[in-house]
Amino acid sequence: GAKLEGIMNYTKIMSAFADPVVMLFLGGFSLAIMAQKYGLDVTLARVLLKPFGTNPKMVLLGFLVVIALFSMFMSNTATAAMMLAFLAPILATFPEGDKGKIALALSIPVSANIGGIGTTIGTPPNGTAVSNLETYFGMSISFGEWAIHMIPFVLIMILVAWVVLQVMFPFSTKKLEVNIPKNDKPTTWRTYLVWATFAVTILLWATESLTGISSNIVALIPLAVFVCTGTFDK
């Protein structure tokens, strides 16, 4: 058969697996997986949605905000699947003909896509854009710098989506009860470890310009912590 020698050095092939963007997403994915595994996502959803009360318009805003927030650190698909599970029982309580349930249902894909813009790990194209800007134009954009510029845009788009959805699909229901089930997963020291690792990683990502620690290096923290403590396996 034909020899493949000289086509590409194996070190170049292997180096692609250690690409900074790949490491950044591995860190983000590990945080998202652990958040779901130990019920952090359910706990956060309960806490964050509670202040929005029972007014349907405010509940819609609450879902838009929470979904966007989760989508900044989790995949859009995982976020949508999780929030749909929370929203399905609520949609079932709507009277027939109430267009408001369409607004709530659409809040999931709309907000998940908007939220993904907010951080470099929100969606793969963001990381690719950062990598290409540095490679071809010499522009280095940190996690914090991206977030500072894009989160205000996300907030504006959330407000626009909130208004548009209400206008197109007005609520006739006057009160909505949001009952998200409690986290039924046992709380262990690993649960607190995941919380702490999540907080420290996000903090270091947001303060890269102050600490001087690259976001790609910070992404190794959750990977190292979860592997060394066996958290992935438990």
Model-predicted segments: where are they?
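Flexible hinge motifs at transmembrane-helix junctions and intramembrane kinks/re-entrant loops
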Residues: 1, 13, 163, 188-192, ...
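Interfacial loop-to-helix junctions that mark the boundaries of transmembrane helices
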Residues: 8-21, 139-152, 184-189, 206-218
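Hydrophobic alpha-helical transmembrane segments
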Residues: 22-23, 57-65, 79, 105-106, ...
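Structural signal for the C-terminal ends of transmembrane alpha-helices
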Residues: 34-39, 90-92, 167-171, 207, ...
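Transmembrane alpha-helix interface/packing and boundary motifs in multi-pass membrane proteins
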Residues: 66-75, 109-121, 204-210
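Juxtamembrane and boundary regions of transmembrane helices in multi-pass small-molecule transporters
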Residues: 31, 96-128, 133-189
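Membrane-embedded alpha-helical segments and adjacent helix-loop junctions characteristic
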Residues: 2-98
